Design a protein with these regions (language model features):
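P/S/T/G-enriched low-complexity
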Residues: 1-165
Length: 165
């Protein structure tokens, strides 16, 4: 199936060292920053019993196999909070999930999270919440993703005392 964004963020969190403040002072370690480029929709398999999906998801969830169902929902920001609570910043580039008004799957599974618009709906709101202050940008189809990502990188670099590989 699609993308398990929250699972990916949890995996990143598990392999990141304890961050420093990036001051380049003796004993300090680099500040950690995670860049997330996404359309903001988790599309993952969850257990039929005991799994949870957003309360606004369209139920019943589609059956994937005998033990799982397919959950499509905006990012659950729990993993973001865990990462940020460790002192790791998160930069988010939202490649907007644009409306597909003639597509039945979109209308029945995604549209309720993308209202009133892709820039202001639940998907965008959760990604803004995931991002560290000042480190959120969005781009629509036809927009310049490279420029948006470069601008985010410049924001991160200009607010970090030193960069290390």
């Amino acid at each position: 199936y699609g993308t398990d964004i929250a699972g990916g963020l949890s995996g990143v969190n598990n392999v990141r060292p304890v961050p420093g403040t990036g001051t380049n002072q003796q004993g300090d370690t680099p500040q950690e920053v995670v860049f997330l480029v996404t359309d903001g929709v988790d599309d993952k398999l969850i257990p039929k019993t005991g799994g949870s999906c957003d309360v606004n998801a369209t139920y019943p969830l589609p059956t994937a196999n005998s033990s799982t169902v397919r959950c499509q929902q905006p990012l659950d920001t729990t993993a973001c909070t865990t990462i940020k609570n460790r002192g790791i910043r998160i930069a988010v580039l939202y490649t907007e999930y644009l409306p597909l008004p003639t597509e039945s799957w979109y209308n029945s599974r995604i549209a309720q999270f993308n209202s009133p618009s892709s820039s202001t709906g639940t998907i965008a709101q959760r990604l803004q919440s995931c991002a560290s202050p000042g480190l959120y940008a969005s781009v629509q189809t036809g927009g310049d993703i490279s420029a948006a990502l470069t601008n985010l990188f410049i924001k991160v670099a200009s607010s970090t005392a030193s960069l290390m590989q």
